[in-house]
Amino acid sequence: VDAKTLKLKKTIQNAGQWVTGLMWSEQTQRIYVANGGGEILILDPKRNRIEKRWKPLGDKPALLLNLAEDSATGRLFVTDNSKAKTTLVLDIHTGEIIKQLDVGDSLAVKFNAKRNELYITQRESGKLLSLDATTYAVKQTWDLPPNPNSLLLSADGQTLYVSVKQPSSREKEATAPDDVIRIAL
């Protein structure tokens, strides 16, 4: 999409099942795309084409959702909320698995370089986790029921904003508004 005119420039075909997450990497100058088929696609934004496809969990069922980057170490964090219920730590250049974080259901992920922390929302469990980004040990857990969802980090890395969704479905709409929680780190 042209950023000035908002007109469609090109459609990239064969992006897999359910494109779920996008992330721009300043380090690699590429766009990383997660999809419901368990793939990470690497896009060249100048040529508008898929350069690589990674399937980090192989043939295991995976619904890769959201992505975050540690540009200093070249790590790519990817959440999975399917049967694997994990967060993957990948080499951003090769797609090789560095570590699989078996923290349970994982939705949003955000890396905080200033504090060397990783934040993961667990929508089903109603929790937010803070992990040490070197050891991957859980440092803190916040109960944020019913469904913590998206994450936004302040520019100074000292405040985390979490959207908390209310339960809803096609059969039953939410009975209360969603919330945004501010956490001083």
Protein language model regions, located:
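Predominantly soluble domains enriched in secretory-pathway, periplasmic, or organellar proteins
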Residues: 1-185
